[in-house]
């Protein structure tokens, strides 16, 4: 499972990140990929990185396999679980930009600074069902990609092939597909952050008992559909705040409200599904903020001249 979130502040600065909700941790950590680091591809020519990247992931055979990452220009991407729907190509297609599905993270962050350019380039992309190596399965993912101006959702499904959606809500969770989630929001148009008022029912005064009545019916469980509704509702209605400290707090307040608490969800294997980490990237200061289920202290990591020009991967 997972929840992705993005918004901009009153100055147009981007805050973008996610919850990672899984049944285990993978030994993930913050990784900085510097400029001029070797970047192999399965179907394209190998190259080196042009832009420094920061995010959370694991290193596999020297390759930074990111769960979410952000380049030095402020473009970010996060991959979220998309089970039962994701279906990638069985092999490369002539005339297409063929990428193993895991390669899209660094392909996007290395080649683009704006979502509008990513959207155009994706028209010629073929995502191939190819794992990073024989020890890993292909993850059934969809992606949210964002800069300070807009966000898109990229899905490759059995039914529709590749689809790219504009994400005006700044939210993504898991299956079903993004268009289904947008349709489902129609069930919640009666929600309002303002409290309900007293009414007269055939002469009988009926009054609310306390605050929060306008949002009565807002979901609070952990299924993807309900996390989508709640995160979208909070993202739309959270007041604008000023300054990085307040906006990072806003970000974590929203995502922690849809976090999966250990013990509340047990999967069919008998394992707890829970929010392993929450992360937020501030594009203005090139700062990656994160905390973990077992360590709530907010940690910060930065892209700066030293880290962006390092001679090897930096892992924390």
From Swiss-Prot:
Domain of life, per lineage: Bacteria
Which InterPro entries does the record associate with it?
CBAH (IPR047711), CBAH/NAAA_C (IPR029132), Ntn_hydrolases_N (IPR029055), Peptidase_C59 (IPR052193)
Reactions catalysed, as given in the entry: cholate + taurine = taurocholate + H2O; taurochenodeoxycholate + H2O = chenodeoxycholate + taurine; taurodeoxycholate + H2O = deoxycholate + taurine; glycocholate + H2O = cholate + glycine
Q: Where does deoxycholate bind?
A: 2, 18
Q: Which cysteines are joined by disulfide bonds?
A: none
Q: In which pathway does it act?
A: Lipid metabolism; bile acid biosynthesis
Tell me the Gene Ontology biological-process terms attached to this UniProt entry: lipid metabolic process
| Keywords tagged on the record | Hydrolase, Lipid metabolism
Which residues does the record give as taurine binding sites?
81
Is the keyword Repressor in the record? Answer: no
Activity versus pH, per record: Optimum pH is 6.0. Exhibits stable activity and retains approximately above 80% of its original activity at broad pH range (pH 3.0-8.0).
**Stimuli inducing this protein:** Constitutively expressed. Exposure to TCA and TDCA has little effect on the gene transcription.
Q: Which GO terms describe its molecular function?
A: hydrolase activity
Gene3D superfamilies noted in UniProt = Penicillin V Acylase, Chain A (3.60.60.10)
The annotated thermal profile of this protein reads: Optimum temperature is 37 degrees Celsius. Exhibits high activity in wide temperature range (10-50 degrees Celsius).
Q: What class of enzyme is it?
A: hydrolase
Q: Which residues form the active site?
A: 2
What PANTHER family does the entry give? CHOLOYLGLYCINE HYDROLASE (PTHR35527), HYDROLASE (PTHR35527:SF2)
- Protein name (record): Conjugated bile acid hydrolase
What organism is this sequence from?
Answer: Lactobacillus gasseri (strain ATCC 33323 / DSM 20243 / BCRC 14619 / CIP 102991 / JCM 1131 / KCTC 3163 / NCIMB 11718 / NCTC 13722 / AM63)
């Amino acid at each position: 499972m997972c929840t992705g979130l993005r918004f901009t502040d009153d100055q147009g600065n981007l805050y973008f990140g996610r919850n990672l909700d899984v049944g285990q941790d993978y030994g993930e950590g913050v990784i900085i990929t510097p400029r001029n680091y070797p970047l192999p591809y399965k179907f394209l020519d190998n190259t080196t990185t042009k832009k420094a990247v920061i995010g959370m992931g694991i290193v596999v055979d020297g390759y930074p396999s990111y769960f979410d990452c952000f380049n030095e220009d402020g473009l970010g991407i996060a991959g979220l679980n998309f089970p039962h729907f994701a279906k990638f190509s069985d092999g490369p297609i002539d005339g297409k930009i063929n990428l193993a599905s895991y390669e899209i993270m660094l392909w996007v962050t290395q080649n683009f600074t704006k979502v509008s350019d990513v959207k155009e380039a994706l028209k010629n992309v073929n995502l191939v069902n190819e794992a990073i190596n024989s020890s890993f399965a292909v993850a059934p993912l969809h992606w949210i990609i964002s800069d300070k101006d807009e966000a898109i959702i990229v899905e490759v499904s059995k039914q529709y092939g590749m689809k790219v959606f504009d994400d005006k809500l700044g939210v993504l969770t898991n299956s079903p597909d993004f268009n289904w989630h947008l349709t489902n929001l129609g069930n919640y148009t009666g929600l309002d952050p303002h409290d309900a008022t007293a009414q007269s029912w055939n002469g009988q005064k009926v009054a609310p008992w306390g605050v929060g009545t306008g949002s009565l019916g807002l979901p609070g469980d952990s299924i993807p559909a309900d996390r989508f509704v709640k995160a979208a509702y909070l993202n739309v209605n959270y007041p604008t705040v000023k300054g990085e400290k307040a906006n990072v707090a806003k970000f974590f307040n929203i995502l922690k409200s849809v976090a999966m608490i250990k013990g509340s969800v047990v999967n069919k294997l008998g394992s707890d599904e829970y929010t392993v980490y929450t992360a937020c990237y501030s594009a203005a200061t090139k700062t990656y903020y994160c905390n973990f289920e077992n360590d709530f202290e907010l940690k910060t990591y930065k892209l700066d001249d030293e880290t962006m020009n390092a001679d090897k991967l930096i892992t924390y």
